[in-house]
Every structure is written in structure tokens, then in C-alpha cells.
Amino acid sequence: PNEINPTYFWHCRLGHISLKRMKKLHDDGLLTSTYFGSFETCESCLLGKMTKSPFAKSCERASELLELIHSDVCGPMSTTSKGGYQYFVTFTDDLSTYGYIYLMRHKSETFEKFKEFQNEVENQLGKTIKLLRSDRGGEYMSQEFDDHLKSRGIAPQLTPPGTPQINGVSERRNRTLLDMVRSMMSKSDLPLSFWGYALETAAFTLNRVPSKSVDKTPHEMWTGKS
């Protein structure tokens, strides 16, 4: 039988991340394969990639963890996942690009998921969230959400209508996650209802592979551990 290209094997195992990211992992000694080369075009990636043009990158970066958190809600998905989920919300730290995802059955759960996220990260890091950037979706603009942010000293940054590029970090994160999910699902024989598990796998992987924005992996910057 034909041997599997080890580089392609790791490409699939790592959620179909780019060859550039894989090379950095290999150069840093984080990939166990002693061989690193190229492989033929990945059909799953071609099926998974979206065709919209990329968002421009924001030029101002946070100088510390939790200084700025980007958030965006995605859904409803065309297929309900195991557990009855149709939406997910992301919270991404600007400095480290470390991201959290939460599966949701309804958009209205966004506020509760933010409080869950806030309690965990502020307790773990010993810091407080300063800014929360999101679009003007109704899930972010309830009086309850606004009152909570004020009580905790968190300034909301709501992007103007029709300007998703201003919330580009969240938009790029969600696009990358969905590209990875589509690539993984097209490569497997699993029912589409397993997309929630694929999404959690993609988020876990993204936090542990090199980012274009930072020198270390997001996980290393977030935890201070290599």
C-alpha cells in the first residue's frame, strides 16, 4: 500500500492548518515527524475554504492580556449539532489571540456565556477585562448586558453598522474556525450534526499552533508556559 505523506498526515491531524504554520511547529521542534515536505493540494481544504476577501488587520494592539476582548456570534447553522446547538460565540484576547468558544442553542445565551467566560479568565489570570468589542447585534445590546459591563468597569466598543472589518479579529477567527470545521467534516464520514465537536477541536488546535500576529503560540502567551 502507498505510504501516507507524513506532512499531509499532520496537516489533517492539526485541523488542516496552513503549511506555513506547520513549518514553524516543525522548526520549533513541536512536530514529532523527522520529515517535513510539501504535499499535493488538499481537496478537503478547497471544499472548506470560504471565498470572501480577507478583512484588513487592526493596527492598534493591546499591550496586556484581557485589555481588549473581541466577540462575535455565529449562526444559526444549517444543521443542528449534537446537543441541540445552532449557534456559537467566540471571545478572543487581542494581545495573545487566545480564543474561547461556547456552543449555544439560542443567541440570547450570549450574556450568560460572557459572564461564564469573564469569571473564568479573570480568576485564572488575576486581571480584569477592560474593553469588549462586538458588533451591534441585539445579543450584546440588552439593558442587562449593558448594566453588567458598567458595574464591572468594562467599556463596550460597538462597531458601526455595516463595518464588520472593524471587528476583524472576531470575523477572521470565526471564518478560520468554520474553514477548519468544513475541511475536517469533508474528510470524515461523520454526520454533519458532529460539527460542534469539530468546532471545539478547531478552537483547541488554533490556540496551540503559531499565529501570524504573535511570536509564540496563543497558549504560550496566555499561560506563560511553553
Where are these regions (language model features)?
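HHCC-type zinc-binding knuckle of retroelement integrases
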Residues: 1-226
